[in-house]
């Protein structure tokens, strides 16, 4: 069964190592029958803790469609890529959003923002009272 997946990949931060590992990941995806790639590069970030003695890494998110039977073999091959520090592949779920819920949420946001704006702007009676005191 073909499913939509989203993979988050963490590579070494060096430019050449990053590009070669990214190409290797793409080759493996194609080899296991992945289609409809959508790539999103997040860029280089500092890591919260060292991963394989690396303090910085480059993140790449790739969305693709693939048969679910090939996922285990793909993960086994991804573990062999030297400059790929970590990866996570998730099934992408498209949720249907009810129009009623969206309208209700938008109304609540409008109502809350309206209340905040009224509190920020002084009413005329408060301004008149301040003028009479002074």
From Swiss-Prot:
This is Small ribosomal subunit protein bS6. InterPro entries: Ribosomal_bS6, Ribosomal_bS6_sf, Ribosomal_S6_plastid/chlpt, Transl_elong_EF1B/ribsomal_bS6. It comes from Borrelia recurrentis (strain A1). Residues 113-122 have a biased composition (Basic and acidic residues). The gene is rpsF. One of its GO terms (biological process) is translation. One of its GO terms (cellular component) is ribonucleoprotein complex. GO terms for molecular function: rRNA binding; structural constituent of ribosome. The lineage of its organism: Bacteria, Pseudomonadati, Spirochaetota, Spirochaetia, Spirochaetales. Keywords: Ribonucleoprotein, Ribosomal protein, RNA-binding, rRNA-binding. Belongs to the bacterial ribosomal protein bS6 family. CDD domains: bS6. Residues 113-134 are annotated as: Disordered. It comes from the Bacteria. Gene3D superfamilies: 3.30.70.60. Binds together with bS18 to 16S ribosomal RNA. Pfam families: Ribosomal_S6.
